[in-house]
């Protein structure tokens, strides 16, 4: 039973990143509890609820293209998933990162997901400094 929960949690996080990378915001947000808490501590952002997160994702991902996640490490328990990845993308609009449009960027991104009743109830994304590549 415990192993099945862990496997389900890992699969959910994989689906979450896949939907983000492909710009399928509604699918990504569908994996959250209604009372999701989403944090980006390095940007001093804390969002509450699916709508706030969806609005943020639409704004954020509208400034990127060719988004890819490269997992360095990922592990889970019955109620947590930790993922350490490198995200690569191309900037398509000004304002989110300190690079001009057209810049290809990589950034280390570590996530801690809390899982409740088969959905993500809290997501903390710890961003390393982005660098042009």
Predicted features along the sequence, with ranges:
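Short, low-complexity N-terminal intrinsically disordered segments enriched in polar/charged residues
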Residues: 1-34
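Internal, well-ordered alpha-helical scaffold/interface segments
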Residues: 14, 30, 51-58
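Short beta-edge strand/loop motif at the mouth of beta-sheet-based domains
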Residues: 35, 45-55
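A beta-strand edge to alpha-helix "cap/lid" segment located at domain peripheries
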Residues: 1-8, 18, 39, 54-133
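Short glycine/serine/threonine-biased micro-segments
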Residues: 21, 47, 123
């Amino acid at each position: 039973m415990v192993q099945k929960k862990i496997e389900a949690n890992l699969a959910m996080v994989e689906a979450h990143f896949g939907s983000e990378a492909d710009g399928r915001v509604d699918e990504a947000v569908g994996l959250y509890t209604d009372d999701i808490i989403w944090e980006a501590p390095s940007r001093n952002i804390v969002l509450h609820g699916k709508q706030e997160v969806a609005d943020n994702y639409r704004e954020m991902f509208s400034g990127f293209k060719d988004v890819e996640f490269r997992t360095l490490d990922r592990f889970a328990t019955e109620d947590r998933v930790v993922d350490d990845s490198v995200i690569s993308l191309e900037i398509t609009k000004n304002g989110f990162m300190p690079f001009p449009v057209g810049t290809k960027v990589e950034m280390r991104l570590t996530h801690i997901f809390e899982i409740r009743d088969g959905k993500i109830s809290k997501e903390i994304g710890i961003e390393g400094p982005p660098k042009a590549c």
